[in-house]
Regions:
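Structural alpha-beta junctions
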Residues: 123-129, 172-177, 205-206
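Noncatalytic carbohydrate-binding groove/subsite architecture in carbohydrate-active enzymes
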Residues: 145, 162-173
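Acidic-and-aromatic substrate-binding clefts and catalytic sites of carbohydrate-active enzymes
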Residues: 137-140, 154-165, 185-197
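Short, acidic/polar
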Residues: 69-72, 163-167, 196-206
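Aromatic-lined carbohydrate-binding surfaces of glycoside hydrolases
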Residues: 1-153, 183-185
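Active-site clefts of carbohydrate-active enzymes
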Residues: 90-92, 150, 168-197
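Glycine-rich loops and low-complexity Gly/Arg-rich segments
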Residues: 38-42, 112, 155-158, 177-180, ...
Length: 207
């Protein structure tokens, strides 16, 4: 219904779902805790710190890939857009738990690239163009070349004074980018509009 509502108003509603990090609540459950990079995730007390820092899939477990593919299949069918945002942001604990042995061998960023490529392959098999958040790839912008050529990198910076360094370096390495400002409305009741306006203005100028 929401997709239909948007389409009637010439708005493209793009599906967006976590496929790597930001799965804290899922990975604390009895059903899925074994898919967490962090061991002993099940049954721990809820923590706002843990919610933001320890929420990444264990890509060594093939069940994690099957889980993500199932999520994508179920979700993508609800949208007419040919775009699909796989997120893949803030994977802070990648290679620090169950995947440490592989990280010691090839590095956590190589693990990141491997996983994003696998997820993109599945998204593309459904006729969708993948998008992902660019905070992790920005640390090694040259590795954007190792991802699908048509992937869209969503470069974000929500601060009062965003810089253009990541934007420029990713552009120099051939990235297709959407620049994403923020409206300063998280963890509070009222948006910080002065900061939001300044952030949007600067990010738009970089674009």
């Amino acid at each position: 219904e929401f997709d239909e509502y948007c389409a009637e108003r010439n708005i493209e509603l793009v599906p967006s779902i976590a496929t790597f990090g930001h799965l804290y609540k899922v990975l604390r459950t009895k059903t899925f805790h074994e898919l967490s990079e962090v061991e002993e995730a099940e049954g721990t007390a809820f923590s706002f710190y843990e919610r933001m820092c320890h929420h990444t899939l264990n890509i060594m477990d093939e069940r994690a890939y099957e889980f993500v593919c199932r999520l994508i299949d179920e979700y993508s069918s609800l949208f007419r857009s040919n775009l699909f945002n796989i997120n893949c942001d803030e994977t802070f604990d990648l290679g620090k738990g169950r995947g440490k042995k592989l990280a010691d061998q090839i590095g956590s960023h190589a693990m990141y690239i491997q996983w994003v490529n696998r997820v993109c392959e599945h998204v593309k098999s459904l006729g969708k163009r993948p998008m992902f958040w660019g905070d992790i790839i920005a640390a090694h912008p040259e590795t954007i070349r190792e991802l699908p050529e048509d992937i869209i990198c969503m470069t974000w910076d929500y601060s009062l004074a965003p810089g253009d360094t990541n934007v420029r370096k990713l552009w120099e390495n051939g990235a297709h980018q959407y620049l994403c400002p923020g409206v300063q409305g998280w963890n509070q009741t009222i948006h910080l509009l002065d900061i939001a306006y300044e952030n949007i203005k600067k990010m738009a100028s970089f674009a």
